Structure formats: structure tokens, C-alpha cells
């Protein structure tokens, strides 16, 4: 009984999020219910509502959780990589695409619903700063075209990478194309397209 009480009060919030993510992986989110999850976790039907107001709030918390995991993964890849600085943007982009390929359901889920203003800005800012840091390391400050701001350059890079990631997660493009982006030269090609559009031309730091 004591173990169940500890389980109920200590881990229930995260375990409910885990149940949502399992439903996402199995494409069963629509039929997911807090009541069924409570039964599976052997807690009272009322217990989850001490953590979440309703199913929607649980789903939103699960999205934020997913985005935090994704951000940590990308940040870890940046910190541990041994690439020269001009390869960091390519490395970040390829890791972004690889995550979408290996976790298609979760990737689609984490960007599927709009968050509240505060949550949206917080999560946007984290991903935005990753690209800002990488581009800053990749290009000199005076490399951008006069009519291109750093913010626009960052958003263009992020949009390009995220768009391809969505194509990968939704299985819209072939496995051969996916492999080209993650392991081949395709990503270098779109990086060159981005660089031509925002720079005059880029001056890579060696």
C-alpha cells in the first residue's frame, strides 16, 4: 500500500505523459483516455486530475515534454561534436532530420498543436537560439546581405530544415532521399542554397 501511495504521488505525472507518448507511437492518441490510463497505472480515476485539468492539458504537457527532449538531444549534439565551425550548421540540420526519421510519430506530435503564448515563445526561443548560435559560429557578422537580418537568416535556415523534417516524418519522400539528406550530400546542397540566399557570399571561419 505504501509503495502504491509513493507511486501515485511521486511518479504519476510523468507516467501519464509516458502513456500519452506510447499512444502517439501506436497512432492511438484519439482513443486515449485518462480513465483507461488510470486503470492501467492502478490509480484512482480522480488521481490524474491532481496534475492535469483534462485530456487536453495532459496532451499539451506531453508536447512540451517531447520538445524539451528534442531540444536536449540537439544541444547535446552541438556540444559534443568535433566538426570544424563551418560544419556545425550542417551537423545540426542532419541531427534534426535524423531525429524526425527515427521518431516520426513523436516529431509530428510535438509540432501538431498550438501551445499557449508563454509556452510557445519559450520553446520557440530555445530552438531559435540553437540556430542563432550555430549560424553565428558558421558565418562572420558582416556576411549577410544588407537586406537580410540575422533573424530572417535564422528563420530561413530553421524553416528549411524543419520543412524537410516534416516530409521525412510523414514519409512523403523516399527512403533513398531521406538517406541522401542524413548521410549523403543532399543536405550540403540545400545548405548552399540557403547560404547563397542570405550571404554575400559566406566567409567560413577555419
Feature map (PLM): residue ranges:
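Short amphipathic alpha-helical segment with a characteristic S/N-K-E followed by hydrophobic residues
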Residues: 31, 54-59, 116
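Basic, helix-initiating cap at the start of DNA-binding domains
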Residues: 1-27, 36, 57
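C-terminal peripheral helix-coil segments that are non-catalytic and often amphipathic
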Residues: 133-141, 163-206
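Append "Primarily bacterial transcriptional regulators
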Residues: 20, 32-39, 48
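Alpha-helical DNA-contacting segments of helix-turn-helix folds
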Residues: 24, 60-66, 110, 123, ...
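Hydrophobic alpha-helical connector segments
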Residues: 76-105, 150-157
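Amphipathic alpha-helical packing segments from all-alpha helical-bundle domains
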Residues: 68, 75, 87, 117-141, ...
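Short secondary-structure transition hinges
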Residues: 102-133, 176-180
